[in-house]
């Protein structure tokens, strides 16, 4: 399937705005950008007075989170968070964000489902769970003694102290599918 965006202004980082360009898209990939007329039998979008720019990258998101409500997180199985994240992912794409770095909430199954195009979502880079020191940000051991850290299969606990524990926890998080380590 081909789509042609005619007469659009293109913003590319580090370059001047290119005006009145024609962009041919084939199978969701840009095939041609030219000032010349393109005659193809395809869907045509009039881009006059509009701008086309590269997708944004959200470097810090929690795609599964709808705020941090410990009670809700504890009451729901992981699948509920997954299904809540699907429409959030589509909203993210519709806002022009084509890549996200999830800094602790999404698991490997979500990334694999996105890669298999089971739903509309940006490209996902996972941290699985952040590494935290005892008493630090995201250490959910409460003064009452209750540990509010949510445990799901595929989510190693993030609490670690000292070099040896951090190295071991890093290996566990990488094994769970992390693309990067959040500390």
For each predicted feature, which ranges?
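N-terminal metal-binding scaffold of metallo-dependent hydrolase/deaminase domains
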Residues: 1-39, 50-52
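Hydrophobic/aromatic beta-strand patches that form the interior of the parallel beta-sheet core
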Residues: 5, 43-45, 125
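Divalent metal-coordination and catalytic microenvironments
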Residues: 8, 23, 28, 49, ...
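Extracytoplasmic/periplasmic beta-strand context in beta-sandwich domains
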Residues: 21-22, 43, 122
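Short, hydrophobic beta-strand segments that form beta-sheet elements in well-ordered domains
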Residues: 30-34, 44, 100-102
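Short acidic/histidine-rich motifs immediately flanking catalytic phosphotransfer sites
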Residues: 40-42, 178
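Metal-associated gating/positioning segment near the N- to mid-region
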Residues: 50-116, 135-140
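Metal-coordinating catalytic core of metallo-dependent amide/deamination hydrolases
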Residues: 118-183
């Amino acid at each position: 399937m081909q789509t042609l965006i005619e007469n659009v202004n293109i913003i590319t980082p580090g370059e001047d705005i290119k005006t009145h360009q024609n962009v041919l898209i084939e199978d969701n990939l840009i095939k041609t950008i030219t000032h010349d007329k393109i005659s193809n039998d395809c869907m045509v979008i009039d881009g006059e007075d509009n701008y086309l720019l590269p997708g944004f990258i959200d470097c810090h998101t929690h795609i599964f989170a709808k705020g941090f409500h410990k009670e809700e997180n504890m009451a729901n199985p992981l699948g509920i968070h997954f299904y809540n994240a699907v429409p959030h992912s589509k909203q993210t794409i519709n806002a022009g964000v084509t890549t996200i770095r999830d800094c602790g909430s999404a698991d490997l199954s979500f990334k694999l489902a996105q890669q298999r195009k089971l739903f509309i979502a940006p490209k996902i880079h996972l941290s699985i769970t952040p590494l935290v020191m005892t008493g630090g940000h995201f250490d959910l051991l409460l003064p009452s003694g209750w540990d509010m850290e949510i445990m799901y299969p595929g989510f190693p606990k993030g609490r670690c102290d000292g070099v040896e524990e951090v190295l071991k926890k890093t290996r566990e998080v990488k094994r769970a599918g992390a693309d990067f380590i959040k500390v």
